[in-house]
Curated annotation (Swiss-Prot):
Disruption phenotype: Increased sensitivity to the beta-lactam antibiotic cefuroxime (CEF), upon overexpression of the c-di-AMP phosphodiesterase GdpP greatly increased sensitivity to CEF. Double disA-cdaA mutants cannot be made, suggesting they are lethal, while double disA-cdaS and cdaA-cdaS mutants are viable. Depletion of cdaA in double disA-cdaA deletion cells leads to cell lysis. Exponentially growing cells are extremely sensitive to H(2)O(2), no change in response to methyl methanesulfonate. It comes from the Bacteria. This is Cyclic di-AMP synthase CdaA. InterPro entries: C-di-AMP_synthase (IPR014046), CdaA (IPR034701), CdaA_N (IPR045585), DisA (IPR050338), DNA_integrity_DisA_N_sf (IPR036888), DNA_integrity_scan_DisA_N (IPR003390). It comes from Bacillus subtilis (strain 168). One of 3 paralogous diadenylate cyclases (DAC) in this bacteria, catalyzing the condensation of 2 ATP molecules into cyclic di-AMP (c-di-AMP). Upon expression in E.coli leads to c-di-AMP synthesis. Probably the main producer of c-di-AMP for the cell; is probably implicated in control of peptidoglycan synthesis. In B.subtilis c-di-AMP is a second messenger that mediates growth, DNA repair and cell wall homeostasis; it is toxic when present in excess. It catalyses: 2 ATP = 3',3'-c-di-AMP + 2 diphosphate. PANTHER family: DIADENYLATE CYCLASE. The keyword Signal does not apply. Residues 82-242 form the DAC domain.
């Protein structure tokens, strides 16, 4: 008995066929999402719709033009979409095309985390003082206005260059907002807490101070010791390792997508205050 002679198996095969096609289309969309290919894809959809409308309305000349555009369009797609097609083929070769991939937001967050971690580690080894504040739910517009607006994409190179001693922007804090560097050389309020160790300087007091009035997270690199600290909710956590900092940033950036029961803070260091 042939496969086609069994109605249930035929329907099941059709369903699997449709699901596979839709899955491949979905993965292709995820590959080109956020690139210029999206706009070109919209143009192709418009051409196809015009072609269908011209056929329905009997507009033979317009239909012929659309047929030519579609015919030559396939060659144009290969040329124009070359970077996206190459990336898709590379992912297919590495076996990642059919694996679960993060959303564009998650991918942007991961790149930001890696850039911050790399920059902080570089500056800590060389004892380059740094003060980096990440905005969360509480707006920090008033503090951003005290600095120099950048609205720049986050990169480890840019962060390092900002905090290089004797450069125009090194004095003050960098404030990040929505995975971007909103401003540099910003002024933060100093904490008056008596529980902060007297051995700590202005950067640490500013970090604790901003964490007392907002829900932001602030990373500090000491220029005296190269130690890395984080201030949050009025508490200062010191002597964080590179791994601990990265884990903490991942927990913070992904808190909205994680279960409440697993959304806790893990620290590898000693708490001051």
């Amino acid at each position: 008995m042939a496969f086609e002679d069994i109605p249930f198996l035929q329907y099941l095969g059709n369903a699997v066929d449709i699901l596979l096609v839709w899955y491949v289309i979905y993965k292709l969309i995820m590959v080109i999402r956020g690139t210029k290919a999206v706009q070109l894809l919209k143009g192709i959809v418009v051409i196809v719709l015009v072609r269908m409308a011209s056929q329905y309305l009997g507009l033979s000349t317009l239909q012929w033009l659309m047929d030519q555009a579609i015919t030559w369009g396939f060659l144009a797609i290969i040329i124009i979409f070359q970077p996206e097609l190459r990336r898709a083929l590379e992912q297919l070769g590495r076996g990642r095309f059919f694996s679960r991939s993060g959303t564009p937001v998650e991918e942007a967050q991961q790149k930001t985390i890696e850039a911050i971690t790399k920059a902080i580690n570089y500056m800590a080894k060389r004892r380059i003082g740094a003060l980096l504040t990440i905005e969360r739910d509480t707006g920090m517009g008033d503090y951003i206005e005290t600095g120099i607006p950048l609205n720049a994409k986050v990169s480890s190179e840019l962060l390092i260059n900002i905090f290089i001693p004797n450069t125009p922007l090194h004095d003050g804090a960098v404030i990040m907002k929505n995975n971007e560097i909103a401003a540099a050389a910003c002024y933060l309020p100093l904490s008056e807490s008596p529980f902060i160790s007297k051995e700590l300087g202005t950067r640490h007091r500013a970090a604790v101070g901003i964490s007392e009035v907002t829900d932001s997270l602030t990373i500090i690199v000491s220029e005296e010791t190269g130690g890395v600290s984080v201030a949050k909710n009025g508490d200062l956590h010191r002597e964080l390792t590179e791994e601990a900092l990265k884990e903490m940033l991942e927990a913070e950036f992904k808190k909205n997508t994680r279960d409440t029961s697993s959304n806790r803070w893990y620290w590898r260091g000693k708490k001051n205050g």
